[in-house]
Amino acid sequence: MYLCHFSSTTLLKKLSGNRRSMAPSLHTLSLLFFFFFFFCFLRLSTAWRPLPRMKNNVTELEFGGYKKYEGSSEFVKLKYHMGPVLTSNITVHIIWYGAWPSAQKRIIREFINSISAAADHRSPSVSGWWKTVQLYTDQTGSNITRSVRLGQEKNDRLLSHGKTLTRLSIQSVIKSAVTAKTKPLPIHPKGGVYLLLTADDVYVEDFCKKCMCAYPFSVPDYIPGLKPLKSPNGEAAIDGMISVIAHEIAEVASNPLANAWYAGEDPSFPVEIADLCEGIYGTGGGGSYTGQMLNDEDGATYNMHGIRRRFLVQWVWNHVVNYCTGPNALD
């Protein structure tokens, strides 16, 4: 993945819902997080998803005594570096770049709305997943906010910056959205997150290189004998995107200025709370195994419920217990 900080966090990623997910000409989607809007420095890091085993799920008994240590390692040194976390309400504004079908938009909207949904809806839940993120505090002891809501949206159907976006032109797309003469997106200096999502015919610079895109809903041909999982909402690209959106909202909340919660000594290359659990979706996950997930009667794989839909979202690092946790944990 490629990341750019604007006195905060900016992220560009793309996902593919097709089996040959490394080919940028196929159906792809990108997202960009932009938090605040001032100066910028660029950094490059590689996102990865672990290669899977041939079995997607195993029984609880097979986990033995290791099921409570998903992702744990004596080498993980997540530290708090005294910077702020997002304790104010988070508002996610979306820029739809290109022609987006309404059905796909609805899936993404519901996921964002599910983060702060009432706790009494079906478990395991998206809001239950966010509780792990809320464990992180600033130096005053204030926790990350419970409130994450969908803000305003802007459609850029005419592709104002062309069908090919670079990291620099992506910055221009967001700047245009917040400075537009008609219906500009509002600027929230304490909790505004700007999410740029590109349609399937838009190419983004360096998309999906040196990584496995949209796994486990898409599997490259070089892994023989493994079929992609059925996505919970019938949209492999969008369902794969949901986990990346969740990943980055969790990290922008816990490390917005690259000086709060992360592992490693270099703040320009931080390993953040979702990076530590990349590819882990359930109990027993770690290494090359995704963990125990849920399968519905229609064959779809998921690990948490939203307001009305189901989603497959990676776990995040829990600094209290020092391993990855999620709402669908068997223990």
Pin down the residues of each PLM region.
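Classical eukaryotic N-terminal signal peptides for Sec-dependent ER targeting/secretion
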Residues: 1-35
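Short, intrinsically disordered, charge-balanced linker/junction segments flanking boundaries
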Residues: 29-33, 197-208
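N-terminal signal peptide
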Residues: 35-54
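N-terminal carbohydrate-binding/catalytic regions of secreted carbohydrate-active enzymes
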Residues: 49-174
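Surface-exposed acidic, glycine-flexible loop patches that form ligand/cofactor-binding
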Residues: 81-86, 176-190, 231-234
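Loop/turn elements at helix/coil->beta-strand transitions in domains of secreted/extracellular proteins
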Residues: 89-92, 189-194, 238
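Solvent-exposed loop/turn segments at secondary-structure junctions
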Residues: 98-102, 200-204, 248-251, 259-261
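Catalytic cores of secreted/periplasmic or lumenal enzymes
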Residues: 209-331
